[in-house]
Amino acid sequence: MGGLRPFAPEFYFYIVGTCCAEISHALRQVTGGKAMTNEDATQLKIRPEDDPWYLLATLYGQPREGDRELQARNRKAWNRYVAQWLNEDAKGAVTKTRSLGAEDTVLLNEEEMTSLREAFAKRHHQAGSSADPEIGQAKPSFIDFSDVEFDRLFWAEGFVFPVVTWFARTRFSEGAMFQGAIFCEKSVFSHAVFSGWADFQRATFHEAEFRFTKFKGGVAMFDNAVCSRWADFEGANFSSANFPSVNFTAALFKDVEFGSAEFPRASFGNVSFPGAIFNFTSNFRGATFGEADFKAAIFKRDPNFVNTDLKGPTSFESVMFSSKPPRFFDAKLHQGTVWRNAIWPLPMLSAEAGDFTDAYERLKLEMDGLKKHEDELYFFKLEMQSRRVMYGNLTDISELRVLGRTISLKRIALKWPASGLPIAIYGFLCDYGRSYVRPLVGLLVTAGVGALPFWLSFGWPSKFWQALGFSLANTFGVIGFRKDFIKPEVTEHLLGILKVFAAIQTVTGIVLLFLFGLAIRNRFRMK
């Protein structure tokens, strides 16, 4: 700082200048090495021809869709040029791929390098590029396509990217072809926008970053893609996502919004979908998970987990299944599978209730096998509620038979209890065997309210306690209270209707006592 005096005006100018320089350096790092300008602030994009890496990728011209011969020439030129920066392990990985051969890693000799430089200079001149016309051989820190706006097909099928590669904030107006591409180091597609289809089939990633990337125009295809370290899709948006048979060591899909999501036969070491939204189909059929986290995810349609293998702890905590329960037929669930605070749907129509019943029955059996008793009871409740809708509470009577005669009831609307009504009563009385409070309250109400007619019969108002005792004895008659505490002549002098009432009270008590005992057994896991 030399002779600058603290608190002098020039001191503050020095500090501000130093801070600005540091901030500028940081922004260049974030933006892939380019200085941040006012154009960046307004999101003005770079013309493809002004990016030197694009010129190299299209060394012999921009191929049209279907022009595989020109694309192959460009690919071989790119791969042989960057092969000088590949180590032996990377070269071995490249030669093992199905789409590339050993010729893609053959180093350019001096004559071929000179020819490539001449071709680059010619391409630079024809494109009217503002990029550096010279192409060097020193290994770069990164390959940078950041902020480029591609208004045409970007065709990088089978390209090898030997160093950190940036496509941050890049826009692809047409299709983007990365099929079979190999990213040897970190690849960054954060905040990129794919307005057309995006093809990453059979691509190989080391570290992949697609944070807040938008795939909004077509299908994003990652079929058979491999990621050896981690893939980060936080905040990404997919109109349609295909990840069949991918092999990701670790992946994060935090707050991702999917249109349709296809993950059949996918293999994940650790994967997280916290806060993800699945707007349409979500297919994980045959997928394998190490540890999985779906906390607070929302499934709006039909989640398919058939034949999935959850090898590690899996969290469905606070998940919302909006329209249909997940299907876990032939799935293998880990004992650490958690459903805490999950929101489950119930069928509205009997036509769909069968699918709900089957799904909840499967989950109930899975929880029974894992000895997760509370979850088993809860899925049994959901199964019963679905069965009630399937069977219905009341059914229409179209005709009535009386003394051998059939009476049509087309003009008279009559109902008859259906098979679902007992299930509804079972749920009301004890929450399908989960609540011992409900039958206990029912017993007290039966005894208390049932005492009123006996009170009137025995003598109002002095015989209240006698009437209450008689009502309690009836309610708990199965235990033998009435025989032990009530004289036989008391019952003999009752009116006939009160005798019928006492019998109904005893039957009600038997049912409620049974439900109370069942709930106690279930709640405290008594065998």
Model-derived segments and their meaning:
Residues 19-20:
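Cysteine-centered motifs
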Residues 450, 513-517:
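Alpha-helical transmembrane segments of polytopic integral membrane proteins
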Residues 7, 11-14:
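Aromatic (phenylalanine/tyrosine) cluster motif
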Residues 23, 36-420:
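N-terminal leader/targeting and pre-domain segments
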Residues 419-436, 454-506, 515:
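Pore-loop/selectivity-filter region of tetrameric P-loop cation channels
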Residues 434-453:
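Segments forming glycine/polar-rich beta-alpha architectures that bind adenosine-containing cofactors
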